[in-house]
């Protein structure tokens, strides 16, 4: 039973598309738009007896056949869909109109529309009269016959088709049985206009035995298996299209050079075009190659027939369609397996083009003579290409972000002009590069280098180039040095991780570091899902005479959704800097782990407010103002924490996440002021006491949930000015070496004048026997002391705590928690 789709009582625009649906208008003035969007073989009915209604036939609509009654018309479209308009004599037929695009067509009455369709007068009664076959809408007019620009589907029988002045399309299939419609005895004459034969090689190859004349475009699709099509010197062809092939397609027998289009060919499926009898091959022979969303591992070969040594010299590649285009290689050869004939490779279009295999040009370099030119001057989408080593290549970029890979072959006669955008030149296969000895580099921002495995990588003379960034790619040898020590002011450096090895010492410096505000930016590009955390590491970052170091934590993006998270992270094992370094700024969306060495004695600022994911930082020097990011941050002070340091959280204040500070202290004093700590917004503060007793003040500690104390040295600690609600952890530090306490712990509140003051001690013993053996001391002004034991405190497990509470002077002592199995 057909589905009825009712309009509203207003003026509606309806676009019939679905099978077995009756579209019915109500009282408004309704518009029904008929277009090629109607599903193939769909059965659609239109009924509307009220209002001033119209049928719009969109430009390009192809009607294979029609039948007219006195008050109804049946239109069979070229895709087999059948549209029946009941009460047709009450409709206006607007040819070429389309309200959805604001296009106005030509209005015709029902009888006028019938006349245009080849029915001179409408029948009466129940008589049906057929209109002219193969009618197409062209602009605001409708004409009959193949010559009007129709689409014709070939039959399994004999087809003798003659076109007219329009742009006609003929659809055929090389199939089996009833699916074989392109037969050797068929005859197609496209006539005038720009005509197309669309051929689907679904079950076999095309041998070229159909008689085809006056057809300008051969559009061929390979499916089911790799297919071949031999055009047998078919004359008049100007364009060859590989139309959405799902398998390899090889086309031969072209007697002249044609434009080649690849339209959404399946990734990994290849296109090979052979031009025959090309006596006209010669200097300057060119081909236009249009790519519409081609695949990254597809191969494209344009070649002459066997024995040909000349071929395509200039290739003009355009990127059209809705997405970027890629190819494994694009080659122009004299013959199959022969030498390249290419001298120029041009790219245009708004979409990015990527070709992974180097563009090969004819001949080899001879002195200063240019072998090949790659020009992306007309490209706005950017290119990612490679040049063959040993050829003198000129590369010109466009307005997009372009990259050109010269591998080992960038010599003094090569040149790169990146144009606008952020452009990259890539070099590899050497241990060092002196930029002053290489080819010309202009309008190019990034130099990417990967040194030969087995040694370090060095870039010199950066001060002589207009480049602004060096990106080092780690080679395949572990702990190798990376060096760039003569950078210009404003230059930056990137480290790209791409395997299980990691760089050793990275030495960076400025050519002129005599200023008092020199800065350097280092971007770390880690691998997502690296084999191990250390695989995104740098053993040592060595800098000198740099006042400000900017670190950006990033990821090598291949899929667009990578992020270095909890088990990963960019790591700098040691930042070795001299006394010039005063500021480190860190930013990024990927986890960062770093240690600042003891050499950086002048460091005063560590600003990680730009970090949106977790960080772990270790400081070996003191008197540093630290700002944390919005992730879960861990800040290790070592033995340097005093009142001269300050820590401020950058915004992570949720209940399920936490920042943490760790520090080892000895001899801090609230009397001298060294123990007056300045910490804001950090949830956990882990303190380990060694050597000498300390006293610290929490008066300037805000936003914390716990101060956790650990020590096995029987060293006393006094914590003063504790705000209400702040828990004191005893043996509750996160680090395994600090999850114990053996000593006297004295705690007092900032305000003990209330009537219900409480201090809570949390026992978090998780180590070996008797790890917590502490004496607790509180003032009598505190009404209650609560001792909460963690759930793993059970004597049977050799895991318990012993407390001396004789100096807890509170009126009420509450003990709770512990393991449920432990009873005493």
Q: Which stretches of residues belong to each language-model region?
A:
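Solvent-exposed, low-complexity segments and loops of surface/extracellular structural proteins
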Residues: 1-824
């Amino acid at each position: 039973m057909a589905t009825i789709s009712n309009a509203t009582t207003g003026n509606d625009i309806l676009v019939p598309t679905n099978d077995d649906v009756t579209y019915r208008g109500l009282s408004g003035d309704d518009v029904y738009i008929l277009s090629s969007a109607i599903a193939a073989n769909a059965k659609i009915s239109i009924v509307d007896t009220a209002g001033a209604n119209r049928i719009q036939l969109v430009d390009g609509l192809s009607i294979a056949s029609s039948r007219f009654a006195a008050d109804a018309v049946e239109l069979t479209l070229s895709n087999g869909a059948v549209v029946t308009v009941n009460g047709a004599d009450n409709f206006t037929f607007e040819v070429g109109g389309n309200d959805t695009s604001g296009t106005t067509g030509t209005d015709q009455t029902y009888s006028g529309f019938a006349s245009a369709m080849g029915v001179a007068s409408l029948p009466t009664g129940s008589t049906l009269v057929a209109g002219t076959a193969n009618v197409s809408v062209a602009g605001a007019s409708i004409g009959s016959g193949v010559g009007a620009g129709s689409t014709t589907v070939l039959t399994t029988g004999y087809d003798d088709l003659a076109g007219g002045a329009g742009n006609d399309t003929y659809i055929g299939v090389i199939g089996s049985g009833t699916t074989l419609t392109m037969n050797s005895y068929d005859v197609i004459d496209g006539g005038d206009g720009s005509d197309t034969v669309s051929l689907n090689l679904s079950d076999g190859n095309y041998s070229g035995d159909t008689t085809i004349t006056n057809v300008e475009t051969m559009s061929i699709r390979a499916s089911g298996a790799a297919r071949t099509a031999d055009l047998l010197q078919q004359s008049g062809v100007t364009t060859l299209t590989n139309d959405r092939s799902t398998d390899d397609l090889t086309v031969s027998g072209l007697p002249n050079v044609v434009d080649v289009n690849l339209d959404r060919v399946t990734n990994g499926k290849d296109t090979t075009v052979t031009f025959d009898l090309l006596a006209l091959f010669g200097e300057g022979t060119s081909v236009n190659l249009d790519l519409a969303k081609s695949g990254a591992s597809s191969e494209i070969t344009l070649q002459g027939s066997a024995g040909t040594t000349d071929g395509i010299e200039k290739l003009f590649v355009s990127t059209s369609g809705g997405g970027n285009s890629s190819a494994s290689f694009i080659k122009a050869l004299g013959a199959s397996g022969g030498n390249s004939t290419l001298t120029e490779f041009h790219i245009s279009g708004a979409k990015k083009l990527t070709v992974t295999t180097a563009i090969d040009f004819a001949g080899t370099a001879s002195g200063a003579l240019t072998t090949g030119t790659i020009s992306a001057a007309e490209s706005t989408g950017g290119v990612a290409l490679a040049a063959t080593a040993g050829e003198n290549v000129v590369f010109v970029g466009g307005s997009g972000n372009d990259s050109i890979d010269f591998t080992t072959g960038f010599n003094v006669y090569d040149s790169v002009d990146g144009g606008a955008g952020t452009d990259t030149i890539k070099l590899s296969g050497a241990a060092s590069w002196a930029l002053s000895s290489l080819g010309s580099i202009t309008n190019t921002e990034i130099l990417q280098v990967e040194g030969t495995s087995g040694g370090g990588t060095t870039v010199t003379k950066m001060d002589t180039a207009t480049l602004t960034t060096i990106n080092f790619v780690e080679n395949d040898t572990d702990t190798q040095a990376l060096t760039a020590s003569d950078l210009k002011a404003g230059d930056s450096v990137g480290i790209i991780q791409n395997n299980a090895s990691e760089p050793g010492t990275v030495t960076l410096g400025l050519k002129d570091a005599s200023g008092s505000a020199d800065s350097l930016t280092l971007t770390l590009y880690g691998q997502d899902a690296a084999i191990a955390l250390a695989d995104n590491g740098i053993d040592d970052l060595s800098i000198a005479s740099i006042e400000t170091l900017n670190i950006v934590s990033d990821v090598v993006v291949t899929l667009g959704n990578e992020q270095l998270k909890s088990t990963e992270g960019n790591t700098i094992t040691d930042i070795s800097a001299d006394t010039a370094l005063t500021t480190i700024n860190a930013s990024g969306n990927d986890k960062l782990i770093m240690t600042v060495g003891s050499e950086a004695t002048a460091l005063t600022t560590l600003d990680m407010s730009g970090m949106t994911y977790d960080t772990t930082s270790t400081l070996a020097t003191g008197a540093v103002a630290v700002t944390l990011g919005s992730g879960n941050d861990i800040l290790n002070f070592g033995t340097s924490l005093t009142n001269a340091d300050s820590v401020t959280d950058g915004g992570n204040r949720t209940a399920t996440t936490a920042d943490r500070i760790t520090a080892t202290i000895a001899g801090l004093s609230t009397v001298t002021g060294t123990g007056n700590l300045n910490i804001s917004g950090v949830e956990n503060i882990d303190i380990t006491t060694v050597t000498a007793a300390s006293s610290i003040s929490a008066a300037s500690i805000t936003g914390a949930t716990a101060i956790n104390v650990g020590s096995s040295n029987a060293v006393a600690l006094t914590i003063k000015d504790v705000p209400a609600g702040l828990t004191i952890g005893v043996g509750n530090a996160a680090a395994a070496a600090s999850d114990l306490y053996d000593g006297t712990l004295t705690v007092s509140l900032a305000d003990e004048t209330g009537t219900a003051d409480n201090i809570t001690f949390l026992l978090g013993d998780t180590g070996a026997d008797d790890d917590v053996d502490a004496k607790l001391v509180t003032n009598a002004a505190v009404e209650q002391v609560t001792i909460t034991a963690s759930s793993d405190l059970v004597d049977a497990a050799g895991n318990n705590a012993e407390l001396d509470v004789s100096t807890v002077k509170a009126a009420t002592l509450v003990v709770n928690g512990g393991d449920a199995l432990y009873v005493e």
